[in-house]
């Protein structure tokens, strides 16, 4: 009986040693590219492409016929090939805050940003909609607004969030005359913005 017991135990030892090794390898592989695994769960809508920045920690989708362009002081930007005023852009700045809610209540934050940061002195701002959403434990403020000047008006969606020690802003917009036609398409872009852990 002693030989049977020792034989069974010796057969279990290699299996028991392999299990932690396999679990460790699995955890390592899963941690190498957590953003790709996260993005793979989401389906990119038809006629859109995904933009994923693994270094700076964010992702969003944009219309597949748009092209990349340089927009001063922004990390990424895409615009319509033919309608130059339709574009999406993302920028971020460092912050000590941990969550967008640390900035204040939704209504106060959005009102301040639109009136004092986004609008030029000659523009009249109008806020149409604002909402807070939580995705994977991260909080986002999204809002729709129009900036009207004597000669020109633009409409936009903005999504703001805080994570990775950064305050992120995504703005997607168009000329107000085209807004009704393209609004739903541009809302998909604004709603797709996600922070990735870096």
Q: What function would you assign to each model-found segment?
A:
Residues 2-4:
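N-terminal intrinsically disordered, acidic low-complexity segments at the extreme N-terminus
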Residues 7-29:
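N-terminal secretory signal peptides and thylakoid transit peptides that target proteins
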Residues 27, 37-38:
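Cleavable N-terminal signal peptides
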Residues 41-47, 56, 68-168, 174-178, ...:
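Conserved polar/disulfide-associated segments of primarily extracytoplasmic proteins
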Residues 62, 109, 182-189:
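Stable alpha-helical elements in mature extracytoplasmic
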Residues 62-63, 128:
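Extracytoplasmic/periplasm-facing segments of secreted or lipoprotein envelope proteins
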Residues 165, 186-189, 196:
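Compact beta-sheet-dominated globular domain cores
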């Amino acid at each position: 009986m002693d030989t049977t017991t020792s034989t069974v135990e010796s057969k279990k030892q290699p299996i028991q040693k392999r299990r932690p090794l396999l679990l460790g390898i699995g955890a390592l592989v899963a941690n190498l590219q957590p953003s790709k695994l996260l993005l793979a769960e989401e389906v990119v809508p038809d006629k859109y492409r995904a933009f994923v920045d693994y270094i700076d920690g964010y992702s969003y989708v944009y219309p597949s016929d748009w092209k990349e362009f340089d927009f001063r002081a922004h990390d990424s930007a895409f615009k319509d090939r033919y309608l130059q005023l339709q574009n999406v852009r993302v920028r971020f700045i460092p912050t000590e805050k941990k969550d967008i809610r640390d900035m204040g209540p939704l209504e106060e934050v959005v009102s301040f940003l639109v009136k004092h940061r986004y609008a030029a002195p000659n523009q009249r701002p109008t806020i149409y909609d604002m909402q807070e959403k939580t995705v994977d434990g991260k909080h986002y403020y999204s809002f729709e607004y129009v900036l009207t000047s004597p000669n020109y008006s633009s409409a936009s969606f903005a999504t703001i969030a805080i994570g990775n020690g950064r305050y992120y802003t995504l703005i997607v917009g168009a000329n107000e005359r085209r807004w009704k036609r393209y609004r739903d398409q541009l809302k998909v872009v604004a709603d797709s913005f996600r922070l990735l852990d870096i």
